[in-house]
């Protein structure tokens, strides 16, 4: 069975259990895949680390949360005018702090020194007029930085975003010393065998809603959805912090 298809079917089973809010027997899960009759040979191989097998099939996420109690996680994404730190600029910052069952979102457009290209406007859906009225990167980071305190950062393809973020924070006199988890690398561990590990490819495999444009907070939510699935695949009933 192709890896992408297997992960897609397993995620449908996890979604069915979340809808039910309780453990279900294998035949009921088979129905979620459109199967009838004996289904164990098909369903059981799909049950990865997310699933708890007792009386029926449940989910480990019902036993322990992500992130764990006492752990703070910040999922972060930047939108930029291009791929080259030092030449290109940040035009949007989005992040979501998760701690103690609370969600603290932050999003802001950023005014660049020169307008983005028409390609970037189409890609992000951010009109240059909106950027002209946005605060500077320094102003945005002064507001965002306190939300990073004592948190593990989760960033998809982290080296790219950090190439913009670290120099900007250092220019303000801040050092970014948080532990960083690259969700792209995490996905490679939890979802081996895929051809691509970009957010679009992972979202397709996990059947997340398609994005209409590249916006920071939308990509933060998609990254979080991917990491949530992969975290339980990898921990499989052995709770630990994301950084571990």
Residue ranges and their predicted role:
Residues 215-228:
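Acidic, divalent-metal-coordinating active-site segment for phosphoryl/phosphodiester hydrolysis
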Residues 2-8, 12, 24, 60-61, ...:
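Acidic two-metal-ion nuclease catalytic site recognized across multiple nuclease folds
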Residues 61-63, 69-166, 170-178, 192-196, ...:
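Conserved non-catalytic scaffold segment of RNase H-like nuclease domains
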Residues 80-82, 185, 222:
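Short, glycine/acidic-enriched loop or turn micro-motifs at the edges of active sites
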Residues 22-33:
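Short acidic, hydrophobic short linear motifs in intrinsically disordered regions
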Residues 1-9, 36-70:
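Charged low-complexity interaction tracts in eukaryotic proteins
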Residues 178-188:
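A short, structured active-site edge motif that brings together acidic residues
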Residues 12-20:
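Short amphipathic alpha-helical elements of helix-turn-helix/winged-helix folds
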């Amino acid at each position: 069975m192709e890896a992408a298809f297997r992960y897609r079917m397993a995620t449908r089973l996890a979604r069915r259990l979340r809808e039910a809010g309780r453990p279900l027997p294998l035949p009921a899960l088979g129905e979620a895949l459109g199967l009838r009759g004996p289904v164990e040979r098909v369903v059981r191989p799909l049950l990865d680390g997310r699933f708890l097998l007792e009386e029926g099939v449940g989910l480990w996420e019902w036993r322990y949360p992500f992130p764990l109690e006492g752990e703070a996680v910040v999922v972060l994404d930047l939108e930029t005018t291009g791929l080259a730190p030092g030449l290109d600029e940040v035009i949007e910052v989005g992040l979501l702090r998760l701690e103690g069952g609370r969600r603290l979102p932050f999003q802001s457009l950023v005014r660049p020194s020169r307008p983005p290209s028409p390609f970037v406007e189409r890609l992000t859906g951010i009109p240059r007029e909106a950027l002209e009225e946005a605060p500077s990167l320094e102003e945005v980071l002064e507001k965002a930085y306190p939300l990073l305190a004592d948190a593990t950062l989760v960033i998809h393809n982290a080296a790219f975003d950090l190439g913009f973020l670290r120099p900007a924070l250092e220019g303000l006199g801040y050092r970014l010393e948080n532990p960083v988890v690259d969700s792209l690398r995490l996905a490679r561990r939890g979802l081996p065998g895929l051809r691509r590990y970009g957010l679009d490819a992972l979202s397709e495999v996990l059947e997340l809603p398609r994005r209409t444009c590249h916006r920071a907070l939308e990509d933060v939510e998609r990254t979080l959805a991917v990491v949530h699935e992969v975290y339980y695949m990898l921990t499989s009933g052995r709770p630990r912090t994301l950084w571990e």
